[in-house]
Swiss-Prot record:
PROSITE patterns to which the protein is assigned, alphabetical: AA_TRANSFER_CLASS_2
Keyword Transferase (UniProt): yes
Modified residues (N6-(pyridoxal phosphate)lysine): K255
Annotated HAMAP family: HisC_aminotrans_2 (MF_01023)
Organism whose genome encodes this protein: Gluconobacter oxydans (strain 621H) (Gluconobacter suboxydans)
Pathway the protein acts in: Amino-acid biosynthesis; L-histidine biosynthesis; L-histidine from 5-phospho-alpha-D-ribose 1-diphosphate: step 7/9
EC main group: transferase
Name of the featured protein: Histidinol-phosphate aminotransferase 1
Catalytic activity: L-histidinol phosphate + 2-oxoglutarate = 3-(imidazol-4-yl)-2-oxopropyl phosphate + L-glutamate
Assembly and binders: Homodimer.
GO biological process, one term: L-histidine biosynthetic process
Molecular function GO terms recorded: histidinol-phosphate transaminase activity; pyridoxal phosphate binding
Length: 401
């Protein structure tokens, strides 16, 4: 662990007195826009250090953030010292090197690629660039939280269509939603986060065709590397590239490439004009130089990525079977996580797991308060989770239903 210091800094001798400043007479929240005052706070999950400090547990099993436990490409890491030696320079604001490699691998021209500080920033940029107060966005429920939060920040109406009872896309309801009122943006993740299910190619094509011609289609493919080997996976780029409508496909280096700590995401767009609009709201140096180069080098090591994805998918099958043996309904997943119905308060169960040193993510959206998302990691992490689960789950759930 990197050491930290709590003593006052000799460079800022007043720093130890800052907590004695008089309280502001104007409530800070009153200064915020109405949309911001009503904005929910995104739950980014707990860190290992926070759990360790609260419960005094030395070993933490972190299964709440869908990280790749196998880490970045070793071949990319060999260049880390070289990368670090130039950190005194500003990064390339155009991210040209990374965009060129992405173009080579995806077939999308560089002027149709946008780089972001994680795909979260890309989602925010989309909302800032294209949503006005009163505009309507349709997504699904449960969903990645920022699909709802960022539209609300812009004063847009975010309408979330619940999944079916068996945790699949409710296609009839989605069709009704995209045709009932004017629609500015359709945004959903595929594979779904947090459920993990896939939308088939025919279903995706039908849903897109049902949208108004000027609706921006945004497909968040943060977990596509885990799904693309499945015969059920529909290549969104193949479906979208022949569409004469605006679209974006979002992807990230945080999951399969193991670069969550560096924050690199990207958007593939239908038109250079969309890229130009996004550039208007993009911070000039929004991605740091280490992140850009590590992402580029990681793309060159597809063998490592495929190896870690394969190990994750194999472990996912074993973990899903183990949860089902314990009587839980587990949604079909094509990602590096599982979504299961705990049949009790997910928050309460997650808290008891924390006391055992295991971090999972309880869902809190209405209608899903008994569901938990657990990341698929190494076999030993799964075993630690299952052992803790067996110790703390309610007696009525101790045998298969």
């Amino acid at each position: 662990m990197i050491p930290s210091h709590t003593a006052p800094s000799p460079f800022f001798p007043w720093s130890h007195r800052m907590n004695t400043a008089p309280e502001c007479r104007t409530p800070p929240l009153s200064l915020a826009r109405a949309e911001v005052r009503q904005l929910p706070v995104y739950n980014a999950g707990l860190s290992e250090d926070a759990v360790r400090a609260k419960y005094g547990i030395p070993r933490i099993t972190k299964l709440g953030s869908n990280e790749n436990p196998y880490g970045p490409s070793p071949a990319a890491l060999e260049h880390w010292t070289e990368i670090a030696s130039s950190l005194f320079r500003y990064p390339d604001a155009s991210a040209e090197g990374l965009r060129e490699e992405l173009s080579r691998q995806t077939g999308i021209d560089t002027d149709r690629i946008v780089i972001g500080n994680g795909s979260e920033q890309i989602i925010r940029m989309i909302c800032e660039a294209f949503l006005s107060p009163g505009d309507r966005l349709v997504t699904v429920l449960p969903s990645f939280g920022l699909h709802l939060i960022w539209p609300q920040m812009m004063g847009a109406r975010a309408e979330a269509i619940p999944m079916t009872a068996d945790a699949r896309f409710d296609l009839p309801q989605l069709h009704q939603a995209v045709t009932s009122d004017p629609l500015k943006v359709l945004m959903f993740s595929n594979p779904s986060n947090p459920v993990g299910c896939l939308m088939t190619g025919d279903a995706m094509q039908s849903l897109i065709d049902a949208c108004p011609a000027d609706t921006l289609i945004v497909i968040d493919e943060a977990y596509w590397e885990y799904a693309r080997s499945s015969p059920d996976y529909a290549d969104s780029l193949t479906i979208l590239k022949n569409q004469s409508r605006p679209w974006m496909v979002l992807r990230t280096f945080s999951k399969a490439y193991g670069l969550a700590g560096l924050r690199v995401g990207y958007a593939l767009t239908s038109d250079p004009g969309l890229t130009a609009v996004m550039t208007r709201v993009r911070d000039p140096f929004n991605s740091n130089s280490a992140a850009l180069e590590m992402a580029r080098l990681s793309l060159l090591d597809q063998e490592h990525m495929h190896k870690t994805v394969g190990a994750t998918l194999a472990e996912g099958k074993a973990l899903k079977a183990a949860l089902e043996e314990r009587g839980y309904f587990v949604a079909q997943s094509f990602a590096n996580f599982l979504f299961f119905n705990a049949r009790e308060s997910a928050s309460a169960l997650a808290e008891r797991l924390l006391e055992q040193g295991v971090i999972v993510k309880p869902w809190k959206e209405k209608g899903y308060e008994t569901w938990i998302r657990v990341s698929i990691a190494r076999p030993e992490d799964s075993q630690a989770f299952l052992a803790a689960l067996d110790r703390v789950r309610q007696p009525s759930h101790s045998s298969a239903a």
